[in-house]
Amino acid sequence: MRRTISQGLVWVAAIFCAAACVSAQVKFTDSTFAPKEGDFIAHDFKFSDGQTLSEIRLHYSTLGTPQRDPGGKVTNAVLILHGTNRAGRVWLAPSFAGVLFGPGQLLDASKYYLILPDQLGAGLGKSTKPSDGLRAKFPHYDYSDMVRASQILLAQGLQVNHLHLLVGASMGCMEGFMWGESNPDDMDAMLLLSCLPVEVASRNRMVRKIMVDDIRHDPGWNNGNYSEQPYGLRAALGHLLVVGSVPTRWQKEYPTAAAADKYVNDYIDQNMKTTDANDFMYQYDASRNYDASKGLDKIRARVLLINPQEDFWNPAELGIAEEQIKKVRNGKFVLLSFPESYGHYTFFQAAAWQKYFAEFLKTLE
């Protein structure tokens, strides 16, 4: 890796967790996985829009200990990139960490050095973001800025010069494709969950625009200088709820009007307590110029892409993933169908896809 390498929504995982997931978990308490946390300050960070911040804070959590070969190369680092507007600690959810991080499990924290960063700009994280003070004057970052910030964290903050595995979900999945193209020697393999490597367009882009406009066109937003969260954020969260829906499961879980109404109210009320409108807008707009489809042949790492059915963001019926993965020389695609699928957020449910992950890891031995 070159020198230029360069309580949140844990509850969401619980919402989608089924009893089938429990049997695969370690006995889980709040202290089962107690990560080390830290901050790295990167100086004079120039954004893709031309603006520069004199310093940015990059927060991270780690589990395990890095191991190096005789040449000093880190051999056991696993970077796990979260989705839009979340934080690294979402991966400590029982349905993920309890299935993967325990003794003898696929990402055993005593074997691997697990790195869970809070990505630049993410509202639920502790890394630098608009709500820290700059609000709408914050640089208009994109995914390339976020990837570069994570690369700087690894190289300069954690002295990690190689990744055995990059795991990315949703936004982190898209960033994985970008990273594998721009720095193909940085990692041995990538597990990418719930995304496509093509331009964010069609329905996916439409929903992002609608959510951003929900806030931007609310007079209460006041060009980002609000004293309380604008009502438009509630509307945006409502749209986010719908696009994260899982029709097959939700018909069983919320079969009455009363149950559906309660879920909507609880979801929005809880998220209004933890979400900032500017952070939300910036994160969902950061995908505006994403398109990894033209460089997939540059990826050298082994790649396993797992997408679920009933994913509003990435419609399986379009067949895009099947076609695009052919461009990756060592790529494989798995489509999870019901009952394995939990919609877009299936990535939180490691028990639903760990058998495919286990097969993939064997190819790295």
Outline where the language-model segments fall.
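Alpha/beta-hydrolase-fold enzymes
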Residues: 186-270
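Conserved acidic catalytic loop of the alpha/beta-hydrolase fold
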Residues: 144-164
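Catalytic active-site module of serine/aspartate enzymes centered on a nucleophile-bearing elbow/loop
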Residues: 332-365
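Conserved alpha/beta-hydrolase "acid-adjacent" motif
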Residues: 312-319
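Catalytic-loop region of hydrolases
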Residues: 25-77, 88-90
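Short beta-strand/loop motif that positions the catalytic acidic residue
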Residues: 299, 305-307
